[in-house]
């Protein structure tokens, strides 16, 4: 299942979070993978994080977001914020059970919280740029 949100503009920030696999472990061993670590040993051990803004991705990965991703790591294909054409889209790709309404509510709540965090950062960034 793919759940996505279109921000209707390019917000200039992107990230990709996905479950670390065997090939990633080899790549990390030989310094072939450039990843961001967030100083959370459980999360860093399970996921690969890539972004164009390390400090912002660390802010997005608040406790509740990390907990959701850890809890659903068996299902997660990837979670990304990326530019598509002239807009930025937040995607959550995972084989969720759409018949489990409680789980779907949790997924939608997770997406809303992530969107609110990103919109909040983007609003602050735009306000700071106007003052400069």
PLM regions: where:
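Charged, low-complexity intrinsically disordered regions
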Residues: 2-132
């Amino acid at each position: 299942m793919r759940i996505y949100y279109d921000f209707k503009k390019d917000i200039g920030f992107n990230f990709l979070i996905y479950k670390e696999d065997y090939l990633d472990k080899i790549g990390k061993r030989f310094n072939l993978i450039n990843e961001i670590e967030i100083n959370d040993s459980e999360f860093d051990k399970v996921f690969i994080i890539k972004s164009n803004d390390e400090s912002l991705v660390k802010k997005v990965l608040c406790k509740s977001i990390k907990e959701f991703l850890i809890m659903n790591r068996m299902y997660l294909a990837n979670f990304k914020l990326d530019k598509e054409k002239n807009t930025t889209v937040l995607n959550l790709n995972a084989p969720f059970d759409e018949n489990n309404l409680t789980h779907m509510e949790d997924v939608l709540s997770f997406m809303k919280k992530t969107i609110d965090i990103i919109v909040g950062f983007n609003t602050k960034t735009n306000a700071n740029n106007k003052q400069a």
